[in-house]
Swiss-Prot record:
CDD domains: TPP_PK. It holds the Pfam family XFP. This is Probable phosphoketolase 2. The keyword Protein biosynthesis does not apply. GO terms for molecular function: aldehyde-lyase activity. Transmembrane segments: none annotated. It comes from the Bacteria. Its cofactor is thiamine diphosphate. Its EC number is 4.1.2.-. It comes from Lactiplantibacillus plantarum (strain ATCC BAA-793 / NCIMB 8826 / WCFS1) (Lactobacillus plantarum). The lineage of its organism: Bacteria, Bacillati, Bacillota, Bacilli, Lactobacillales. InterPro entries: Phosphoketolase, THDP-binding, Transketo_C/PFOR_II, Xul5P/Fru6P_PKetolase, Xul5P/Fru6P_PKetolase_C, Xul5P/Fru6P_PKetolase_CS, Xul5P/Fru6P_PKetolase_N, Xul5P/Fru6P_PKetolase_ThDP_BS. GO terms for biological process: carbohydrate metabolic process.
Length: 796
């Protein structure tokens, strides 16, 4: 660009400037099509041969030109207004968009020096797309500027919102696919404007890419009229701006005009909020961008429309190395962008076009927020000893684990209030999950009207977002908050974390790929998920609320990037959370009790359990370092309590029985194929090679069975959740699943040859008390006194 255009007097709406924008757009489109089809001859300087074309062109075209158009105009707005902006590519299967644009702006070459901005580099760029050993057809972690892959649809706005929290100068230009808009999470996420503060947070700018079609169907919103769409988005609290058309020349002018209005509207909102301390919810602008699917591509094929049709979705014309009979049509398409006007003899973008591209960190692909690990500040954490319950008399005192954790979280918020890099999320469950102490130092962030005393704990600024009953929203915002370098947690009912288990899978894939395949990405704070109101504490809500399967779901992944913690009491939970919240590049699942329970471990004991992942509990063992008769292993709150009660029964009846009691906190450390897993020798030192192991476990039995399959000791008896539940008493939940103390005693005696016969009378005693339990709860509606009044007695 000329010096005059670089000056402050530039007319960003002039025909000259928009001509350059159009040229840039054409260049991005050319490169995007080239990535689909070409191996060689990237600029078509020679006649196209079969060896120039891929054997299997793979990828998608339908969304590309529209997004490239949007990207080009966002660049223009960045230049005009000096914006701090990054791009989120919501539509599925549009990987070329961010690759092509980061290549044109130089970020791609800076990241991958072999992909040079010339003919040789363009050839490499084209070959690698959707190619073995190359790059994906989505904006995966290898893509500069991406924090959102867009493989599984529905999370674009949520990721934009999580990124702009506590980033008041940042704009997340979030392109939403009209197919994506039909997903549950995306339909929900239009409500994020009720949670973003115009003073302390940045701005999400949704751009609905209304191209009309999905894979083979029309999109719902595209068939609504202009008036219906306007009413719909206004009703959701947005101010929609429309850019609609098919003629590129006209669309450039419309887009420039409307985008200017949008940016000026954003600036006016922010200025008013800051100048007048006005934290009322503004009507943030958004853009409805209606242009044809497959815009600028082939108009038709074999008598049927392509542009403006679902047929533009993938590879629009059938040309590959083995089918070159229509190669001239591919050449016509590529040459329609006039590459000779865009690239010089070396294949480099012409300088007059490159001059309108933002520079340095102003480039969306180079925005520092998209490599958030480099922005991460260390979290300031409290001393966990300050929250220690005494517990020297093991089990003497009752307490709520989550209530105690709430005190730690309260102080974590206070310690990091200046850095503003810690938040919590929940779907209207923070109080229910007993984290109420956190509200001693903060409020729920909420931008809607507040009606006290009917409302409570709401404010325009707060470190907890839990006023939207959407697990998708919580998970999505936390993911982006982490990916942009900040810390947080998401606490929910255990069974309803299954709502987002596919989101957790997608985040796991991002963490793994970014760590293993993109050394230029710095590790980011871990995603911390607290599963409370667990299956065994849902006696009052019943069977629908009882599903502990989230741990099995995560354990199936590469566990180098997953931790599954099952703390047995409050001290262990606090030590676990303190470790998890400071970790990087992991998904930490913490399964935590919220109801009052006996408190077992001193803080020193808890620290050792969390450090080592498991440990022999000396005060609950009678083997004194010798080979035990039976091993009790526990993972979880109720399993620990019930196993200790079982040990006390056995010891009272058979004081000579040698029992080893193991508490497991970090379950996946037992896996042989986990990088942190115990060696066989270490495993055998805990569990022996052949002695019976009574493993009381919080979730489904099969996970523990799978873990032990690769170990020497197969004398395993797992008592977990066996899909038995109802509205009943707390103890009956354990009885139904044979996780209670009486079933555990029976299992231990039957599995230990020396005691199977001489313990027959005790087995009968256990059966009798189980019969009593059955009748008693149905008559009284509460658990038997033997359970309600039980206390741990030190073993002699």
């Amino acid at each position: 660009m000329s010096e005059a255009i670089k000056s402050k007097t530039v007319d960003y709406s002039s025909d000259e400037y928009l001509k350059r924008v159009d040229e840039y757009w054409r260049a991005a489109n050319y490169i995007s099509v080239g990535q689909l089809y070409l191996l060689n001859n990237p600029l078509l300087r020679e006649p196209l041969k079969a060896t120039d074309v891929k054997v299997h062109p793979i990828g998608h075209w339908g969304t590309i030109a529209g997004q490239n158009f949007i990207y080009a105009h966002l660049n223009r707005a960045i230049n005009k207004y000096g914006l701090n902006m990054f791009y989120i590519e919501g539509p599925g299967h549009g990987g070329q968009v961010m690759v092509s644009n980061s290549y044109l702006d130089g970020t791609y070459t800076e990241t991958y020096p072999k992909i040079t901005q010339d003919k040789a580099g363009m050839k490499r760029l084209f070959k690698q797309f959707s190619f073995p050993g190359g790059v994906a057809s989505h904006a995966d972690p290898k893509t500069p500027g991406s924090i959102h892959e867009g493989g599984e649809l529905g999370y674009s706005i949520l990721h934009g919102a999580g990124a702009v929290l506590d980033n008041p100068g940042l704009i997340a230009a979030t392109v939403v696919g009209d197919g994506e808009s039909e997903t549950g999470p995306l339909a929900t996420s239009w409500q994020v404007n009720k949670f973003l503060n115009p003073i302390t947070d940045g701005t999400v700018l949704p751009i609905l890419n209304l191209n009309g079609f999905k894979i083979s169907n029309p999109t719902v919103l595209s068939r609504e009229s202009h008036e219906e769409l306007e009413d719909y988005f206004k009703g959701l609290g947005w101010d929609p701006h429309f850019v609609e058309g098919t003629d590129p020349a006209k669309m450039h002018k419309i887009m420039a005009e409307e985008l200017d209005k949008v940016i000026e509207e954003i600036h006016a909102i922010r200025k008013n909020a800051k100048d007048n301390n006005d934290e009322s919810r503004p009507k943030w602008p958004m853009i409805v961008f209606r242009a044809p699917k497959g815009w600028t591509g082939p108009k038709s094929w074999d008598g049927e429309p392509i542009e403006g049709s679902f047929r533009a979705h993938q590879i629009p014309i059938p040309v590959d190395r083995n089918h070159m009979e229509h190669a001239d049509k591919l050449v016509d398409w590529l040459k329609s962008y006039k590459p000779e006007e865009l690239f010089d003899e070396n294949g480099t973008l012409k300088p007059e076009i490159a001059a309108i591209i933002p520079e340095g960190q102003a480039r969306m692909a180079a925005n520092p927020v998209t490599n958030g690990g480099k922005l991460t500040k260390d979290l300031i954490t409290p001393n966990i000893d300050d929250y220690a319950l005494d517990n020297k008399s093991h089990g003497k005192e009752d307490g709520s684990d989550m209530t105690e954790l709430g005190k730690y979280i309260r102080d974590l918020i206070e310690l990091n209030k200046d850095n503003k890099n810690f938040r919590g999320w929940g779907p209207d469950e923070t109080l229910s999950n007993k984290l109420g102490a956190a509200f001693e130092d903060t409020k729920r962030q909420w931008m809607e009207p507040i009606h006290e005393p009917n409302d409570a704990l709401l404010a325009p600024q707060g470190r907890i977002i839990d006023s939207m009953l959407s697990e998708h929203m919580d998970e999505g915002m936390l993911e982006a908050y982490n990916l942009t370098g900040r810390y947080g947690f998401f606490a929910s009912y255990e069974s309803f974390l299954r709502v987002v288990d596919s989101m957790l899978t997608q985040h796991f894939k991002w963490l793994r790929n970014s760590h293993e395949e993109t050394p230029w990405r710095a590790d980011v704070p871990s995603l911390n998920v607290i599963a409370s109101s667990t299956a065994f504490q849902q006696d009052h809500n019943g069977y629908s609320h009882q599903d502990p399967g989230i741990i099995s779901h995560l354990a199936e992944k590469k566990t180098e990037y997953v931790r599954a913690y099952l703390p047995g009491d409050a001290n262990t939970l606090i030590a676990t959370f303190d470790k998890a919240i400071q970790s990087k590049q992991l998904i930490n699942l913490i399964i935590a009790s919220k109801h009052p329970r006996p408190q077992w471990f001193t803080m020193d004991e808890a620290k050792r359990l969390v450090r080592d992942g498991l440990g022999v509990v000396d005060w609950a063992s009678t083997d004194h370092g010798e080979e035990p008769d039976v091993v009790f292993a526990t993972a979880g709150s109720e399993p620990t309590t019930e196993s200790l009660a079982a040990v006390s029964i056995l010891h009272a009846r058979f004081p000579e029985m040698k029992i080893r009691f193991i508490n497991v906190v970090d379950l996946l450390k037992l896996k042989k194929d986990d990088p942190r897993g115990l060696s066989d020798a270490e495993f055998d030192a805990f569990f022996t090679k052949d002695k019976p192991v009574i493993f009381a476990y919080h979730a489904y039995d099969d996970l523990v069975k799978t873990i032990f399959f690769d170990r020497h000791n197969h004398n395993l008896h797992v008592h977990g959740y066996r899909e038995e539940g109802d509205i009943t008493t707390p103890f009956d939940m354990r009885v139904r699943n044979e996780l209670d103390r009486f079933h555990l005693v029976k299992a231990a005696l039957l599995a230990t040859p020396a005691y199977a016969e001489k313990g027959a009378h005790v087995i009968q005693e256990m059966n009798s008390i189980l019969d009593k339990h059955h009748d008693y709860i149905r008559a009284e509606g509460t658990d038997i006194p033997e359970v309600e009044n039980w206390k741990w007695t030190a073993l002699k």
